[in-house]
Structure formats: structure tokens, C-alpha cells
């Protein structure tokens, strides 16, 4: 017996039943983004490894442990994108989009990270990314937060999600703070948990994210980042908070909130939920005002966010908000005898040409008529049309209304009109 083949660990198939929810979510997302005048951009899955190293930082978990990198046949180091912002920045620089006054972009697609798979965290995962370039005032920070808030309301999850926000100042501010944070944590070096010991001299900001109870107690005594932030960043953040207050947006100022990627500065935020265990961040983002210049472009302010689609789907499924009920087939066409198959196909195409919105299914199964009729009923089809040699010869077709339990005989032209009456009632 051949050994069963399986997908790569941490990479999943998304089957039609689940994708019904995905498509409904994606449609809502796209409508909201369009209403805010954001334009879609489609980006390569592969990028040069060095741009992630430059942008994300060599001593981050993403670059050190999580990237899928390899060399191509010419020896170039390439990486499956672990996130979308870097590729988007590369694209706007390469294609001179900022000179065309293009500012607001969105994309949706797979990202890849070599992490330990668990509920809500996979090695291939889908993200919505939204990026805005060229605007440096807190007004655009507010627009981003208003947009996300509107999305949560339209999805029906706004009561199950909370916003945490912080300002992490400039890179220089964080360098000053990092020295003080390391100096403080060295006093507790012997009792730090293993993750914190590893990060103490490489990426101490990630220690602020620790979920360890002992670490949380220690961090309560730690110096606060806000005391090292420049006046401009403080004013920017205070202005944003005042505007959020005026719009009634609820938020938590989490002074330990930092982001795991080096390119962030000033405003950072996360939207969190409680329903899916430790992987409770469903949306995260912030400003990255130096990244465009660091990757070779002109100095350009920027802000963006990403939403994990799998985590969003998990939440919506747990709340039973969006139904994945099978959409009914409108017309189920049954042909009797192999010789009548061509006529059945032709009729289905003719109906599609006249009524392109209808869902039409042609049953190609080689089984009895009674079995095909049962299949039509089980499919929840609205009507079934039976086609046999006699029907074609006499131009008289049996239409079974499976919802009302009625049967009719029609000529082909009458059949086309009856379909219109059934599915295109006046006013619809």
C-alpha cells in the first residue's frame, strides 16, 4: 500500500465549505476599503532576502528563526514573504507610485513563517495588509483606526475585540530606553525566564511582550518607554488620543506594547480578542516613517496594519456570526441517456447567456433517473429540468419546482420565460 501523502506541516487546505465564510469576509473588507478610496496592489510572494534583513532587523525572531529562505539557481538568496509591508514599500519605490500621487494601498494573500503551528498560527497564513504613504499627521492614524473600527462593526465582532495603543517614539529614543531597560533587567538576570534571557542582549523590547507571570511582576518596576520619547512623538500621540476620544473610540494605553519588527516608530497598535487562546492579536500595525528611505526611496512618512485572516475566521466561526450555509442551486438539469448530454449542455449555456446570475448545475452522473432526481432534491435546487429524447423531439420539457412540489410541461421558449418568472420576480 502506498503511504498516504499529507500537506506540509503548518500549511492547510482551505476547502469550499470554509471558503464560504472567507469570501463573505473578503467582500466586506473590500467594500470598506473601497469606500475609503484604498486601491488594491498585488505583490510577489518571493522577495530578495536582503530587503527583509534591512527592514525587519537581523536580530528579530522573524529574520533569525522564521523566514523561509533559499538560493535560486544563480545563487541569489530569496525569501517567501513573512509579511507584506516590505514588499509593498519595495513596489512603490520601484514603480514610482508616490510621484503619481498614489497613497493608499491594500493587498491580501499568503505569508510564510517557520513557527510552531497551533490554533490561529500557521506556517502559511493569509493577511490583509493596508499601507498609507506620504502623510505624517495623526489624522491618517485616526483614519486607519476608524476604518478598522468600521470593519469590526460590519463583521459584527466589535463587542468582542479591544484596541491597545502606544507610542514607541523614534529609533534614537528606543536606543536610549533599551540601555536603561537592559540595565534594569540585568538585576533580575538569574530569575528571568528562558525566552527573556535569550532576548536580553539581542532584542530586549520583546521581553515587554512576555506572557510569563513572573516577568510581568518584574516589568511592573521597569523604566517606562514614555519617559524617553521625544516631544514631537508625544504630541503626535496625545493628539491622536484626543481625536479618538472625540469619536468615542475605546482604547487601552498599553505602555508595554511594542512591535516585533524594527521598522516601526511612534504610533503602534494591536486589536486583541480572547476567544482563540494565546494567539489573541488579530490586527496590528503602526507608523514606519523611515522605512521607505531605508529601502532606497525618498524620506516618506507611512503607516499601515495587517489582519490575520485565519484568526478572524476563527473568531467569526466561534461567534456563529456569518453562516456558511450552502447557497442553493437555482436550476438542476437532468438528461436521460448519453445521447442527450449535448442538448443538456447547450440548454444550460443558453440559460446562462440569458440569465448570467443564476447557478445552473448539469448532472453528469451515470445513474438512474430516480437517483438523479434525489440528487437534485438533496442539492436544495429550486427547480429541475428533465431532458430526454422524447422531450427534445416534441419540444416539451418537464420542469419540476422542487420548492413547491409542482410539475410543468413547457416548450423551450416557454421554459425560458418561466425561469424569468421564478427567479426574476417583479421588483427584484
Swiss-Prot record:
Principal place of residence: cytoplasm
Question: Which top class of enzyme applies to this chain?
Answer: ligase
Q: Which GO terms describe its molecular function?
A: ATP binding; histidine-tRNA ligase activity
Any Pfam family the entry gives? tRNA-synt_His
Looking up InterPro entries in the UniProt record yields:
aa-tRNA-synth_II (IPR006195), aa-tRNA-synth_II/BPL/LPL (IPR045864), Anticodon-bd_dom_sf (IPR036621), His-tRNA-ligase (IPR015807), HisRS-like_core (IPR041715), HisRS/HisZ (IPR004516)
**Is-annotated flag, keyword Nucleotide-binding?**
yes
Reaction catalysed? tRNA(His) + L-histidine + ATP = L-histidyl-tRNA(His) + AMP + diphosphate + H(+)
Known EC number = 6.1.1.21
Any one GO CC term of the record: cytoplasm
Cellular localization per UniProt: Cytoplasm
Example GO biological process term?
histidyl-tRNA aminoacylation
Keywords assigned by UniProt?
Answer: Aminoacyl-tRNA synthetase, ATP-binding, Cytoplasm, Ligase, Nucleotide-binding, Protein biosynthesis
Keyword Calcium present in the record's keywords: the answer is: no
Q: Which NCBIfam families match?
A: hisS (TIGR00442)
Q: Which family does it belong to?
A: Belongs to the class-II aminoacyl-tRNA synthetase family.
The subunit structure is:
Homodimer.
- Protein name (Swiss-Prot/TrEMBL): Histidine--tRNA ligase
Q: Which organism is it from?
A: Buchnera aphidicola subsp. Schizaphis graminum (strain Sg)
Name of the gene this protein is made from: hisS
Amino acid at each position: 500500500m502506498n503511504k498516504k501523502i499529507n500537506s506540509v506541516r503548518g500549511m492547510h487546505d482551505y476547502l469550499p465549505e470554509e471558503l464560504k465564510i472567507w469570501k463573505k469576509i473578503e467582500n466586506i473588507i473590500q467594500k470598506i476599503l473601497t469606500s475609503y478610496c484604498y486601491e488594491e496592489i498585488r505583490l510577489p510572494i518571493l522577495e530578495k532576502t536582503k530587503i527583509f534583513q534591512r527592514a525587519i532587523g537581523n536580530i528579530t525572531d522573524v529574520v533569525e528563526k522564521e523566514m523561509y529562505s533559499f538560493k535560486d539557481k544563480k545563487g541569489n538568496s530569496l525569501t517567501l514573504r513573512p509579511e507584506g509591508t516590505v514588499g509593498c514599500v519595495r513596489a512603490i519605490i520601484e514603480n514610482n507610485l508616490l510621484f503619481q500621487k498614489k497613497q493608499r494601498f491594500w493587498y491580501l494573500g499568503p505569508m510564510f513563517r517557520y513557527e510552531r503551528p497551533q490554533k490561529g498560527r500557521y506556517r502559511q497564513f493569509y493577511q490583509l495588509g493596508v499601507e498609507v504613504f506620504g502623510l505624517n499627521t495623526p489624522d491618517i492614524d485616526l483614519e486607519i483606526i476608524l476604518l478598522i473600527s468600521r470593519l469590526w462593526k460590519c463583521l459584527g465582532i466589535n463587542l468582542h475585540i479591544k484596541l491597545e495603543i502606544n507610542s514607541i517614539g523614534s529609533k534614537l529614543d528606543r536606543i536610549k530606553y533599551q540601555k536603561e531597560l537592559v540595565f534594569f533587567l540585568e538585576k533580575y538576570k538569574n530569575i528571568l525566564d528562558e525566552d527573556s534571557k535569550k532576548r536580553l542582549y539581542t532584542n530586549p523590547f520583546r521581553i515587554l511582550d512576555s506572557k510569563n507571570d513572573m516577568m510581568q511582576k518584574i516589568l511592573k518596576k521597569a523604566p517606562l518607554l514614555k519617559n524617553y520619547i521625544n516631544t514631537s512623538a508625544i504630541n503626535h500621540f496625545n493628539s491622536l488620543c484626543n481625536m479618538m476620544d472625540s469619536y468615542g473610540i475605546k482604547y487601552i494605553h498599553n505602555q508595554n506594547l511594542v512591535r516585533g519588527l524594527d521598522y516601526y516608530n511612534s504610533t503602534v497598535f494591536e486589536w486583541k480578542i480572547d476567544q482563540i487562546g494565546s494567539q489573541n492579536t488579530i490586527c496590528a500595525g503602526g507608523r514606519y516613517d523611515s522605512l521607505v528611505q531605508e529601502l532606497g526611496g525618498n524620506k516618506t512618512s507611512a503607516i499601515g496594519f495587517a489582519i490575520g485572516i485565519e484568526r478572524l475566521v476563527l473568531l467569526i466561526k466561534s461567534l456563529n456570526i456569518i453562516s456558511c450555509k450552502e447557497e442553493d442551486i437555482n436550476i438542476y438539469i437532468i438528461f436521460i441517456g448519453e445521447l442527450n448530454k449535448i442538448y443538456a449542455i447547450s440548454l444550460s449555456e443558453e440559460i446562462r447567456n440569458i440569465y448570467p446570475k443564476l447557478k445552473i448545475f448539469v448532472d453528469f452522473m451515470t445513474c438512474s433517473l430516480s437517483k438523479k432526481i434525489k440528487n437534485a432534491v438533496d442539492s436544495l435546487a429550486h427547480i429541475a429540468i428533465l431532458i430526454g429524447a422524447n422531450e427534445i423531439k416534441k419540444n416539451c420539457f418537464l420542469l419540476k419546482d422542487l420548492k413547491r412540489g409542482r410539475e410543468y410541461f413547457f416548450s423551450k421558449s416557454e421554459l425560458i420565460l418561466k425561469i424569468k418568472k421564478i427567479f426574476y420576480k417583479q421588483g427584484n
